[in-house]
Swiss-Prot record:
It is a multi-pass membrane protein. Keywords: Cell inner membrane, Cell membrane, Magnesium, Membrane, Transferase, Transmembrane, Transmembrane helix, Ubiquinone biosynthesis. It comes from Marinomonas sp. (strain MWYL1). It is an enzyme of class 2 (transferase). GO terms for molecular function: 4-hydroxybenzoate polyprenyltransferase activity. The keyword Signal does not apply. This is 4-hydroxybenzoate octaprenyltransferase. GO terms for cellular component: plasma membrane.
């Protein structure tokens, strides 16, 4: 039982916030591609795929960080740096979760299967970027957004649809914004051990850049709504998101670690709010 608990911690099954943040834009894409009537077996496949692939991403992330996590207060007790899970076990778990994700995508179509290989590559690449660039959050944004063209493809959507790629870019902006809040919690430790992040790159302008990224996200989501002819309820949900983003800024204004982490967590409500507005729009 202790080993299962360690695996759950390594895969973040016990902390599903990252899976939710990946799930919401995936569901946005399914609903947009299907004009509000997605095939329910695809909804199930993608929700399961989100949780399995995000868990695989967490495992490979901790494997990549195994040499430095022991020097960071927040991560020093994770299964790998503490020795509760071996490197071999971590790699086997990553492979198992990746295979599970691939089995799920086999229930879609060839085009989506081919797109999934790009998604796997992005998920495996992201954890190593923090050693080479101050923009690892950009690579996370690309990895978290790749489910969007996959969802469009599985639903039979047009991959040249501008709404698809606007949603892709909007989600990249949103991901960089909320993961910068997350990186702000580790900034003092990261500076000591040489790990790079947007929180370090943006420095004293971190909150200003986050606000700009959130503004770009909402602008693109508004444009998508106009192009799709969505109901006014969708735009109300975006106005609510403005309030949620302001609350995050106000909460993190003093850059307290716990406050920044709460601002990161609050983005689950943003994703949920946009989804509710989208679903409500298609019901009207």
């Amino acid at each position: 039982m202790n080993k299962l608990k360690d695996y759950a911690e390594l895969t973040r099954f016990n902390r599903p916030i990252g899976s939710f943040l990946l799930m919401w834009p995936t569901l946005w894409a399914l609903w947009l591609a299907a004009d509000g009537m997605p095939q329910w077996h695809l909804v199930i496949i993608f929700i399961l795929g989100v949780f399995s692939m995000r868990s695989a991403g967490c495992v490979i992330n901790d494997y990549a960080d195994r040499k430095v996590d022991g020097f960071v207060d927040r991560t020093k007790n994770r299964p790998l740096p503490s020795g509760r899970v071996s490197e071999k076990e971590a790699l086997m778990l990553f492979c198992a979760l990746s295979i599970l994700s691939f089995i799920l995508v086999l229930f879609t179509d060839l085009r989506t299967i081919l797109l999934s290989f790009v998604g796997l590559g992005l998920a495996a690449l992201y954890p190593f970027m923090k050693r080479y660039t101050h923009l690892p959050q950009l690579f996370l944004g690309l990895a978290f957004s790749w489910a969007i063209p996959m969802a469009y493809s599985a639903q039979g959507g047009d991959l040249t649809d501008p709404k698809l790629w606007m949603l892709f870019v909007a989600n990249c902006f949103w991901t960089i914004a909320y993961d910068t809040y997350y990186a702000m919690t580790d900034r003092p430790d990261d500076l000591k051990i040489g790990i790079k992040s947007t929180a370090i790159l943006f420095g004293q302008y971190d909150l200003f850049v986050i606000i700009c990224l959130q503004g770009l996200t909402l602008s693109l989501l508004t444009w998508i709504g106009l192009l799709a002819g969505l109901h006014w309820l969708y735009f109300v949900s975006l106005i609510v998101c403005v309030g949620l983003f302001y609350q995050q800024f106000k909460q993190a204004k003093e850059r307290d670690r716990q406050a920044c982490f709460r601002s990161f967590l609050d983005n689950n409500r943003v994703g949920y709010c946009v989804f509710i507005g989208l679903v409500a729009s298609y019901f009207m």
